[in-house]
UniProtKB/Swiss-Prot annotation:
<keyword id="KW-0378">Hydrolase</keyword>
<dbReference type="Pfam" id="PF02811">
    <property type="entry name" value="PHP"/>
</dbReference>
<dbReference type="InterPro" id="IPR016195">
    <property type="entry name" value="Pol/histidinol_Pase-like"/>
</dbReference>
<feature type="binding site">
    <location>
        <position position="41"/>
    </location>
    <ligand>
        <name>Zn(2+) 2</name>
    </ligand>
</feature>
<dbReference type="InterPro" id="IPR003141">
    <property type="entry name" value="Pol/His_phosphatase_N"/>
</dbReference>
<feature type="binding site">
    <location>
        <position position="16"/>
    </location>
    <ligand>
        <name>Zn(2+) 2</name>
    </ligand>
</feature>
<feature type="binding site">
    <location>
        <position position="8"/>
    </location>
    <ligand>
        <name>Zn(2+) 1</name>
    </ligand>
</feature>
<feature type="binding site">
    <location>
        <position position="102"/>
    </location>
    <ligand>
        <name>Zn(2+) 3</name>
    </ligand>
</feature>
<feature type="binding site">
    <location>
        <position position="10"/>
    </location>
    <ligand>
        <name>Zn(2+) 1</name>
    </ligand>
</feature>
<keyword id="KW-0479">Metal-binding</keyword>
<dbReference type="GO" id="GO:0071978">
    <property type="term" value="P:bacterial-type flagellum-dependent swarming motility"/>
</dbReference>
<dbReference type="InterPro" id="IPR023710">
    <property type="entry name" value="Phosphatase_YcdX_put"/>
</dbReference>
<comment type="similarity">
    <text>Belongs to the PHP family.</text>
</comment>
<feature type="binding site">
    <location>
        <position position="193"/>
    </location>
    <ligand>
        <name>Zn(2+) 1</name>
    </ligand>
</feature>
<dbReference type="InterPro" id="IPR004013">
    <property type="entry name" value="PHP_dom"/>
</dbReference>
<feature type="binding site">
    <location>
        <position position="132"/>
    </location>
    <ligand>
        <name>Zn(2+) 3</name>
    </ligand>
</feature>
<dbReference type="InterPro" id="IPR050243">
    <property type="entry name" value="PHP_phosphatase"/>
</dbReference>
Length: 246
């Protein structure tokens, strides 16, 4: 099982990450990736960049060190209404929008609130993926959220950093998430959640988990660049002409 796209990476602009876009691209190339997404934290996260940072990603070349670069964000889920912290104008300029719960922005409360927030953000049509849903601090109703995600063509992320200790208790939940999504015929994305270049494309904990549950490779949108670009186009994103050869 191999994943040639990393849909979750951070740069120094996130405030608590330590590499540049160029350094991440070089690391991605060394890992043999075909593509990675730049997904810095959106403005409400402490230390995160101004919204201009996201609007100006258009200056980033589409290919760096022979690796395709997609322009994205890890937005914050703000409330149970499912609002996120970037406006429509900027979101429409980005290739890839993830939304995640983060403790400094949305303090965990109860299963009902978390479920309602996820359902609303999925229904909003503004996000392509839910980041690190395996975080045990944010319990939610798997059945309703995953079925709604499949209905709206929003994918759940299996996050390598969560499986490597950054969110204690995520291992069992991520396995349960993968098994449930497999059962309903849904799809997932895989992200390193790299905060340092050496971790870009690091799926050493994701791969054995997905093998363990026998997750179908065709339901993993990050298996190669074309499967990922096809997913974005399914979601109504404009084809990226510079990457048409992939």
């Amino acid at each position: 099982m191999q994943f040639l796209v990393d849909t979750h990476t951070h740069t120094i602009s996130s405030g608590h990450a330590y590499s540049t876009v160029l350094e991440n691209a070089a690391a991605a190339s060394q890992r043999g990736l075909e593509m990675f997404c730049v997904t810095d934290h959106a403005p409400t996260m402490p230390g995160a960049p101004h919204f201009w940072h996201f609007a100006n990603q258009r200056v980033i070349p589409r290919l760096l060190h022979g690796v395709a670069v997609l322009r994205g964000v890890e937005a914050n889920i703000l409330n149970i209404e499912g609002e996120i912290d970037l406006d429509e104008r900027i979101i429409n300029q980005l290739d890839w929008v993830m939304a995640s719960f983060h403790e400094p922005v949305f303090r965990y409360t109860n299963k009902s609130d978390h479920t309602q927030a996820l359902l609303n953000v999925i229904r909003s049509g503004r996000v392509d993926a839910i980041g690190h849903p395996g975080n045990p601090n944010y319990d939610f109703d798997f059945e309703s959220v995953f079925k709604e995600a499949a209905k709206h063509n929003v994918v759940m992320e299996i996050n390598n950093s969560s499986l490597s200790g950054s969110r204690v208790g995520s291992e069992i939940r991520c396995e349960d998430i993968a098994m449930y999504i497999k059962e309903i015929g849904g799809r997932i994305t895989t992200g390193s959640d790299a905060h340092f270049a050496a971790d870009v494309g690091n799926f050493e904990s994701v791969e054995p988990l997905l093998k363990k549950v026998n997750f179908p490779i065709e339901s993993i949108i990050t298996r190669h660049s074309r499967s990922f670009l096809d997913f974005l186009e399914e979601r109504g994103k404009k084809a990226i002409s510079e990457l048409a050869h992939l």
